[in-house]
Amino acid sequence: MRCPFCTAEETKVIDSRLAADGYQIRRRRECIGCKERFTTFESAELALPYIIKNNGNREPFDLNKLEVSLNRALEKRPVHADDVDNVISKIIFQLKALGEREVPSKSVGHLAMDGLKQLDKVAYIRFASVYLSFDDIEEFTKEIEKLRE
């Protein structure tokens, strides 16, 4: 690997360890030429599937759309940005791990709901109310009762 400081081609690995719950390898490297040290992360590259919308259209997975919808549900909630990033990373990992070329949008919605349920119950209800198209207070009540179980 090239050194990011002097662009020399030879570097050596000083230390390797697992990171990101075992899904990445963190390596400390040292440049043979300039002796600078830097960190790299190695992970398997898996393609994200296309999303099949409810109307049958297919579109590439849109990370921005997922981030916006989760952040909208989490607006004014006491949740750290790193926790939101972890939920997003977990959703992306789960989508890649499916190994499917296409996934229904409902699957992405359910993964988002699962992540929010673990993170913040109020945000979960907010997201569910839009995603599941709640029509009346009874549907809110049923979903809240499920959370209490």
Swiss-Prot record:
Which Gene Ontology BP annotations are present? negative regulation of DNA-templated transcription
What are the boundaries of the unnamed zinc fingers? 3-34
Q: Name one GO molecular function term.
A: DNA binding
What are its cofactors? Zn(2+)
Report if keyword Zinc-finger is assigned.
Answer: yes
Question: Which regions span the lipid bilayer?
Answer: none
Q: How is the cofactor bound?
A: Binds 1 zinc ion.
- Is Cell membrane one of the keywords? no
Q: Which UniProt keywords apply?
A: ATP-binding, DNA-binding, Metal-binding, Nucleotide-binding, Repressor, Transcription, Transcription regulation, Zinc, Zinc-finger
Signal sequence annotation: none
Q: Where is the ATP-cone domain?
A: 49-139
Similarity annotation: Belongs to the NrdR family.
Its job:
Negatively regulates transcription of bacterial ribonucleotide reductase nrd genes and operons by binding to NrdR-boxes.
Q: What is this protein called?
A: Transcriptional repressor NrdR
Which species is listed as the source? Answer: Haemophilus ducreyi (strain 35000HP / ATCC 700724)
